[in-house]
Amino acid sequence: MDNTKEILTLAVEIGDAMLRCGAEIYRVEDSVIRILEAFGLDDFDAYVLSNGIFASANESREDACSVVRYVPLSATHLGKLAALNQLTRDICNHKCSVAEASERLKQCKNIPVYANAVQLLACGIGCAAFTFMFGGHLPEALYAFFVGLIEQ
């Protein structure tokens, strides 16, 4: 297969984006493996850690290639993660080519994050709601709201 490096790089980039969005390590590793299989690679290895991805293909042939990627910790973004999971499903169902998958990956990476004010407010409201849910009253909920703002 002449585009092995392109496929391997795409799979690792999708895994990188998933890790950055807060995906579990086993899910990222499984997704990378499934993507490589979906594009027809059969001689490959992929290993995912909490802050890195190691992948290689065609180790026994002349066109062997490897990709190592450091993935720094970042904030959780479930919207991006859902889009990346859908992209992985579409690749596994053979609904997109390598070029289409690369373009969709760029779109997934450009999904905007919520403004800090919205995130702070949501955290405060969530803390207050849990206070009510566990039997607290208005004074405790107000304290929880402000603690949620501070701790966010």
Role assignments for model-derived ranges:
Residues 1-96:
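Soluble N-terminal domains of membrane-associated systems
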Residues 102-111:
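Cytosolic juxtamembrane amphipathic/interface segments immediately preceding
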Residues 92-101, 115-120:
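Short, flexible active-site-proximal loops enriched in glycine and acidic residues
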Residues 112-152:
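Core alpha-helical transmembrane segments of integral membrane proteins
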